[in-house]
Regions:
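Amphipathic alpha-helical segments at domain termini/boundaries
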Residues: 1-16, 154, 158-240
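STAS-typified acidic loop motif
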Residues: 7, 28-54
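N-terminal short beta-loop-beta anion/metal-coordinating cradle
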Residues: 15-34
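A structural preference for short, pocket-lining loop segments at secondary-structure junctions
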Residues: 36-41, 55-84
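Short strand->helix junction
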Residues: 45-46, 80, 119
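Short, hydrophobic/amphipathic alpha-helical packing segments
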Residues: 53-61, 95, 129
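Conserved catalytic cores of soluble enzyme domains
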Residues: 83-197
């Protein structure tokens, strides 16, 4: 398990002013590629509830009140909070609000990249880290939409069959490597590195117009992990 303090020191050796308040990471840092980056994220395998979602949005909107600068989103989440209270108050709308704010930042001149350094599960990942212009992951990261046993209970497909399918298709399989094959992850880092972060930021800042385009389906086709998405979108576009 990555200790957040060690992660921050490895990513931002030029210095940072970042706080970890329970499950919330927020602050600013200096990098070799940008004088100032805003850093927002989750820690301790946080289950994202309505309160945490609003805290993420609060810090995102505070950054947007200032001059444009890159956003670095750090991801360690066990997914959305699975509590009756959260469902009753409409947690899905809170998560949608987080996704909208990250997307609004992207379209407002705040280029973003996310780094999965711990867990990345379900809605906690989809609404935040996966919304960035570029998504990276440490090799040790645990990425999945749903545990195969939970998937078996819901779909009524035997667990053994899902294990077999996961071995054949990255769509069913957890892990950073499988998400990279599907195009969801830009690249996998063996360890947290300021050199890798600076290179990723430099690429992002040098090609901001391209960065705002979503090429994940093309990456999925090139890497052999998602073969139909790009062709389907192209066919729909050609039929207009």
């Amino acid at each position: 398990m990555i200790v957040v303090a060690h992660l921050l020191d490895a990513l931002f050796p030029e210095g940072h002013d970042i706080r970890v308040d329970g499950a919330l990471i927020h602050g600013s840092a200096r990098t070799g590629a940008a004088e100032s980056v805003a850093v927002i994220g989750t820690a301790n395998a946080a289950a994202v509830d309505a309160a945490l979602a609003l805290s993420l949005v609060e810090h995102l909107l505070a950054v947007l009140d200032g001059p444009p600068r890159p956003l670095v989103l750090l991801v360690d989440t066990s997914g959305q909070a699975l509590r009756r209270h959260e469902e009753l108050i409409g947690l899905n709308a809170y998560l949608a609000h987080v996704a909208e704010c990250v997307d609004f930042a992207r379209r407002s001149g705040f280029p973003s990249l996310s780094l999965v350094y711990g867990q990345a599960v379900s809605g906690g990942f989809l609404s935040f880290g996966m919304m960035a212009d570029r998504v990276y992951a440490l090799a040790s990261a645990q990425i999945r939409v749903m545990d195969l046993r939970a998937m078996a209970r819901i779909t009524k497909i035997p667990h053994e069959e899902l294990v077999r399918l996961a071995a054949e298709s990255p769509v069913f399989a957890p892990g950073a490597e499988n998400y990279a094959r599907m195009g969801a992850i830009e690249a996998i880092w063996s360890e947290p590195s300021s050199l890798l972060l600076n290179a990723a930021l430099a690429e992002l800042l040098g090609h901001q117009a391209v960065a705002r385009e979503d090429h994940r389906r093309e990456f999925g086709q090139l890497r052999g992990g998602r073969l139909l998405a790009a062709r389907t979108v192209a066919a729909i576009g050609a039929a207009r």
